[in-house]
Amino acid sequence: MVRLPLKCLLWGCFLTAVHPEPPTSCKENQYPTNSRCCNLCPPGQKLVNHCTEVTETECLPCSSSEFLATWNREKHCHQHKYCDPNLGLQVQREGTSKTDTTCVCSEGHHCTNSACESCTLHSLCFPGLGVKQMATEVSDTICEPCPVGFFSNVSSASEKCQPWTSCESKGLVEQRAGTNKTDVVCGFQSRMRALVVIPITLGILFAVLLVFLCIRKVTKEQETKALHPKTERQDPVETIDLEDFPDSTAPVQETLHWCQPVTQEDGKESRISVQERE
């Protein structure tokens, strides 16, 4: 029973000798190794050899296409990011031994994700639609329909809806109304149209005036008849004075129209018409 604790003690001493415990803590920018604290390699350099009892940590600068941004004990530097133009990327800032290359989307493109590993073209607003919000490096174009009085006749990622042209302000007349895709068409007023409209207008005015005069005349005649009623016309009676004629008792020979004598019968009075006497 005494030998078991002794064996455990011996094994503990053996393991401690083979794997010595590192120091409990190292200074800032140091790392523990082989029971000692070694300095970390500064930004822009990579680790070549750990420190020993007689040497310091051995570091080597990164190549021109590599970088390390922090204090480290890395054996290899990181490659600079490649801004692939086929993905719509371009270099915003070249990388150094301490910093990585910064990529941004080229003109007319925006990032497809938060890491901006690739870019895509801005969406276009087609005719009838205008740009409500322009695209940025991380967001796409937002379009909106053109309201009444505005139009857009192009496909664009930057053009807003434009107002219709005011023909009146230019002294012109509207020949064709605008739509959400087309502008108003203005032009000069046609002379031929004026030559047609003017006579028609004058004719209408003349007709109205003529009707007015006729109505006025009829109304005036009716008023006159009402004030002065018309009296019934009587034919004059012709009177004949009998004194101008001889005594009707005297025998008179009657004649006909053809001057032929007519024999008066006894006992009948002679009747001569007023016309024959005249």
Swiss-Prot record:
Coiled-coil regions in this chain?
Answer: none
Task: Write down the InterPro entries for this protein, in alphabetical order.
Answer: TNFR/NGFR_Cys_rich_reg, TNFR_5, TNFRSF5, TNFRSF5_N
Tell me where the TNFR-Cys repeats sit in this chain.
25-60, 61-103, 104-144, 145-187
* Secretion signal span: 1-20
Q: Name one GO cellular component term.
A: CD40 receptor complex
Q: Where in the cell is it found?
A: Membrane
Q: Which residues lie on this side of the membrane: Cytoplasmic?
A: 216-278
Q: What is this protein called?
A: Tumor necrosis factor receptor superfamily member 5
Q: What intrachain disulfides are recorded?
A: C26-C37, C38-C51, C41-C59, C62-C77, C83-C103, C105-C119, C111-C116, C125-C143
- GO process terms (BP): B cell activation; B cell mediated immunity; B cell proliferation; CD40 signaling pathway; cell surface receptor signaling pathway via JAK-STAT; cellular response to mechanical stimulus; defense response to protozoan; defense response to virus
As one GO molecular function, the record gives:
signaling receptor activity
Keyword Repeat belongs to the record? yes
Keywords recorded for this protein, A-Z: Disulfide bond, Glycoprotein, Immunity, Membrane, Receptor, Repeat, Signal, Transmembrane, Transmembrane helix
**Any stretches that span the bilayer, and where are they?**
195-215
Question: Which residues are on the Extracellular side of the membrane?
Answer: 21-194
Q: Which domain of life is it from?
A: Eukaryota
Q: Which residues are glycosylated?
A: N153, N180
Q: Which Pfam families match?
A: TNFR_c6
Q: Topologically, how does it sit relative to the membrane?
A: Single-pass type I membrane protein
Q: Which SMART domains match?
A: TNFR (SM00208)
Summarize subunit and interaction data from the UniProt record for this chain. Answer: Monomer and homodimer. Interacts with TRAF1, TRAF2, TRAF3, TRAF5 and TRAF6. Interacts with TRAF6 and MAP3K8; the interaction is required for ERK activation.
Function according to Swiss-Prot or TrEMBL: Receptor for TNFSF5/CD40LG. Transduces TRAF6- and MAP3K8-mediated signals that activate ERK in macrophages and B cells, leading to induction of immunoglobulin secretion.
